Swiss-Prot record:
Pfam name, any one: CTP_transf_like
Keyword Transferase: yes
Catalytic activity: nicotinate beta-D-ribonucleotide + ATP + H(+) = deamido-NAD(+) + diphosphate
Family that this chain belongs to: Belongs to the NadD family.
Function: Catalyzes the reversible adenylation of nicotinate mononucleotide (NaMN) to nicotinic acid adenine dinucleotide (NaAD).
Alphabetized GO MF terms: ATP binding; nicotinate-nucleotide adenylyltransferase activity
Keyword list, A-Z: ATP-binding, NAD, Nucleotide-binding, Nucleotidyltransferase, Pyridine nucleotide biosynthesis, Transferase
Any Gene Ontology biological process: NAD biosynthetic process
The species this protein was found in: Bacillus cereus (strain AH820)
Pathway the protein acts in: Cofactor biosynthesis; NAD(+) biosynthesis; deamido-NAD(+) from nicotinate D-ribonucleotide: step 1/1
Name this polypeptide is given: Probable nicotinate-nucleotide adenylyltransferase
EC number(s) stated in the UniProt entry for this protein: 2.7.7.18
InterPro entries xref list: Cyt_trans-like, NadD/NMNAT, Rossmann-like_a/b/a_fold
Length: 189
């Protein structure tokens, strides 16, 4: 059976923290690949101003293009409305019955697991992989595999704020993503 990691997110913008997590889990669990799963409208972020799907996808392509073992999965972008992990993973497990999926989440999402839509059924479809994130614990009543990663305290919200305040984001996200953001005037206001 193939082992594939999935890291879902808004990726608004994608940064070195996302890439570090994906790479560390890839090696720790001996995965075949890691798929980045950009979402349409995450249920926990409804109502927030999110950068266009086209821009987020372009930035994600730029961020992941150098890694052979990273791919982008468009499953959630093909649906309108809120993206529920259960619905996505149900589709993916039917589409790829020979794959064991490892769904990678940060400590913030580990704490949020009890509120996930259809969590009990989702546990039958994936193995959750929790990675530590500053300020969060990996304690949950649900079974998760934990992977220790070097601490890298960067988030998409921090980067959006830094761009808004006209602060440098060098060394926090790939240079090609930085150039795209600056050329397209993203996160300026």
């Amino acid at each position: 059976m193939r082992k594939i990691g999935i890291i879902g997110g808004t990726f608004d913008p994608p940064h070195y923290g996302h890439l570090l997590i994906a790479n560390e889990v890839y090696h720790a669990l001996n995965l075949e690949e890691v798929w980045f799963l950009p979402n349409q409208i995450p249920p926990h972020k409804q109502g927030r101003n999110i950068t266009s799907v086209e821009s987020r996808l372009q930035m994600l392509e730029l961020a992941t293009e150098a890694e052979e073992h990273f791919s982008i999965c468009l499953e959630e972008l093909s649906r309108k409305g809120p993206s529920y992990t259960y619905d996505t993973m149900l589709q993916l497990t039917k589409k790829y019955p020979d794959v064991q999926f490892h769904f990678i989440i940060g400590g913030d999402m580990v704490e949020y697991l009890p509120k996930w839509y259809n969590i009990e059924a989702l546990l039958d479809l994936v193995t959750f992989v929790g990675v530590a994130r500053p300020g969060y614990t990996l304690h949950t009543p649900y079974p998760i595999t934990t992977v220790e990663i070097p601490e890298f305290a960067v988030s998409s919200s921090l980067l959006r704020e830094r761009y808004k305040e006209k602060k440098t984001c060098k060394y926090l996200l790939p240079e090609k993503v930085q150039v795209y953001i600056e050329r397209n005037g993203l996160y300026e206001s």
